From Swiss-Prot:
<feature type="binding site">
    <location>
        <position position="221"/>
    </location>
    <ligand>
        <name>substrate</name>
    </ligand>
</feature>
<protein>
    <recommendedName>
        <fullName>Pyridoxal kinase PdxY</fullName>
        <ecNumber>2.7.1.35</ecNumber>
    </recommendedName>
</protein>
<keyword id="KW-0808">Transferase</keyword>
<dbReference type="GO" id="GO:0005524">
    <property type="term" value="F:ATP binding"/>
</dbReference>
<comment type="subunit">
    <text>Homodimer.</text>
</comment>
<keyword id="KW-0547">Nucleotide-binding</keyword>
<comment type="similarity">
    <text>Belongs to the pyridoxine kinase family. PdxY subfamily.</text>
</comment>
<dbReference type="GO" id="GO:0009443">
    <property type="term" value="P:pyridoxal 5'-phosphate salvage"/>
</dbReference>
<dbReference type="InterPro" id="IPR004625">
    <property type="entry name" value="PyrdxlKinase"/>
</dbReference>
<dbReference type="InterPro" id="IPR023685">
    <property type="entry name" value="Pyridoxal_kinase_PdxY"/>
</dbReference>
<keyword id="KW-0418">Kinase</keyword>
<feature type="binding site">
    <location>
        <position position="147"/>
    </location>
    <ligand>
        <name>ATP</name>
    </ligand>
</feature>
<dbReference type="GO" id="GO:0000287">
    <property type="term" value="F:magnesium ion binding"/>
</dbReference>
<dbReference type="InterPro" id="IPR029056">
    <property type="entry name" value="Ribokinase-like"/>
</dbReference>
<dbReference type="GO" id="GO:0005829">
    <property type="term" value="C:cytosol"/>
</dbReference>
<feature type="binding site">
    <location>
        <position position="9"/>
    </location>
    <ligand>
        <name>substrate</name>
    </ligand>
</feature>
<dbReference type="GO" id="GO:0008478">
    <property type="term" value="F:pyridoxal kinase activity"/>
</dbReference>
Length: 287
């Protein structure tokens, strides 16, 4: 069984960060080692919360503890999400380097949370660090539309521009870019676009866009988690993308139908593993 070290925020109540990522990856047959960068009572969109961030040095100490018992060599991948400070971002880099030094076959997938995530905004300097440092280290990245623009340093309005932006990042090191949400001026307003790009291929997929009165938090974290889990299970990029598109839709639809604010992960767990509605992905020739 594959093992992934997941470095993200955590909420006790609800689903955001690791609270949105751990269970879906486990449901897909992957062992998850959660390292929580932030421990909160709930996500901040509620307007009231309690909690704090973990000290960056403690992040490295925790991973050193795993290494001390000889288990770090069994880590197959690292997934990072919300990093609250430049110090946490630097610690994440050192952790990835340690994992890769211990297991040269391990890979790193970066969800570059640069904006407000669940109401949490990173400290000044995090965005600049992510843009400057993480693409050279990552084997894959999962930006949303805004984050893709920041990573590529350009405005993006079409699929063609998005593919070109992804390829510019791939030239820095990552082998795959998953765009979790792509705004395309040519797409219908009631569709949610996702895109995945490699050096030589690109696929786009669409699912229905639901009009929530309050949009649930954690959808992006869920998206990255499912994609990583499917890749760890041996899926091709396209197969992992199509499964992710279908499974995330199933969770979002279950949440919408139940009129909930928090993602219905447990209720939709069978759909995460075996989605009943598939949307497929088609090759985009945009260069």
């Amino acid at each position: 069984m594959k093992n992934v070290l997941s470095i993200q925020s955590h909420v006790i109540y609800g689903h955001a960060g690791n609270s949105a990522a751990v269970f879906p990856m486990q449901r897909l047959g992957v062992n998850v080692w959660p390292l929580n960068t932030v421990q909160l009572s709930n996500h901040m969109q509620y307007g009231h919360w309690a909690g704090s961030a973990i000290d960056a040095a403690k992040m490295e100490q925790l991973v050193d503890g795993i290494a001390a018992i000889g288990a770090l060599k069994r880590c197959d991948a690292v997934l990072s999400g919300f990093l609250g400070s430049p110090a946490q971002a630097r610690a994440a880099v050192e952790i990835v380097r340690t994992v890769k030094a211990t297991n040269p076959n391990a890979w790193y997938f970066c969800d570059p949370a640069m904006g407000q995530t669940g109401g949490i905004r990173p400290e000044p300097g995090v965005e600049e660090f992510i843009v400057a440092e993480l693409p050279e280290l990552a084997d894959g990245m999962a930006p949303n539309h805004s984050e893709l623009q920041k990573l590529a340093g350009q405005r993006i309005e079409t699929v063609a521009e998005a593919v070109a932006a992804c390829r510019s990042i791939i030239r820095r090191s990552p082998q795959v870019i998953l765009v979790k949400h792509l705004h395309d001026r040519n797409s219908p307003a009631d569709r949610f676009n996702m895109l995945v790009v490699t050096e030589t291929e690109a696929w786009i997929g669409q699912r229905p866009l639901y009009a929530f009165p309050r949009h649930p938090v954690g959808v992006g974290d869920l998206t990255s988690a499912i994609f990583v889990a499917r890749r760890l299970r041996g899926d091709s990029v396209r197969a992992a993308f199509e499964h992710t598109l279908a499974a995330v839709h199933a969770v979002v639809k279950a949440t919408y139908d139940a009129r909930r604010y928090e993602l219905e992960l447990v209720a939709a767990q069978d759909e995460i593993a075996r989605p009943s509605e598939w949307f497929g992905a088609w090759v985009t020739g945009a260069d």
